Amino acid sequence: MKIYIIDNGGQWTHREWRTVRDLGVDSTIVPNTVDADVLADADGIILSGGPASIESEISKLGNIKEYMHRYNYPVLGICVGAQFIAIDSGGRVSKALHAEYGKKIVNFTSKDGIFYNIPDSINAWENHNDEIKSISDDYIICAYSDTCRVQAFYHKNRDIFGVQFHPEVNNTEHGTTIFKNFIEKCRR
């Protein structure tokens, strides 16, 4: 099994890689500009977080649109990766009314997809100025915080998932469970 971590310049990309590796899966970090052919053997991809603002710097996200549409593997978007999935689906992302930094309580309204075996509420690590305002009807919004309406989502028919928070950071409760559940989707 092989999962590629697509590096969008996030400060915790190596933590995503290490978490997947520590769960026994071959994983490789690649820049978001790598040719899509490199990902032909992927069983899944993780779109890392990063400092780019979707509103003004979407070009800094390289080829991730092609990665999502060329192959039919599971995708997990984290932070700006999730925001890209929302934009790509026809949703809207813009500056957050309240930027989130540090621990926040994230509440789950549905625990399907990769969000099973997680309590109804968790402490999660946040680090974002932009947020998802809307997403296509093809997705289910399944988690929120008191200041961010879309903390997690999943596609109704495909294995595409997104989280605004950072499950790779130790301060996020049950973050490893989210990665384990994603890996299980990649095994199918």
From Swiss-Prot:
GO cellular component: cytosol
Pathway: Purine metabolism; GMP biosynthesis; GMP from XMP (L-Gln route): step 1/1
Keywords carried by this UniProt record: ATP-binding, Glutamine amidotransferase, GMP biosynthesis, Ligase, Nucleotide-binding, Purine biosynthesis
Entry EC no(s): 6.3.5.2
Single Gene Ontology MF annotation: ATP binding
PROSITE patterns: GATASE_TYPE_1
Database matches in InterPro entries: Class_I_gatase-like, GATASE, GMP_synth_GATase, GMP_synthase_A
Listed Gene3D superfamilies: 3.40.50.880
Secretion signal, residue range per the UniProt entry: none
Residues forming the catalytic site: C79 (nucleophile), H166, E168
Disulfide bonds: none
Alphabetized Pfam families for the sequence: GATase
The keyword Ligase belongs to this UniProt entry's keyword annotation: yes
Residue stretches making up the Glutamine amidotransferase type-1 domain: 2-188
Subunit and partners: Heterodimer composed of a glutamine amidotransferase subunit (A) and a GMP-binding subunit (B).
The protein's role, per its UniProt record: Catalyzes the synthesis of GMP from XMP.
PANTHER family: GMP SYNTHASE [GLUTAMINE-HYDROLYZING], GMP SYNTHASE-RELATED
NCBIfam families, per the entry: guaA_Nterm, PRK00758.1
Protein name: GMP synthase [glutamine-hydrolyzing] subunit A
Organism: Picrophilus torridus (strain ATCC 700027 / DSM 9790 / JCM 10055 / NBRC 100828 / KAW 2/3)
Gene for this chain: guaAA
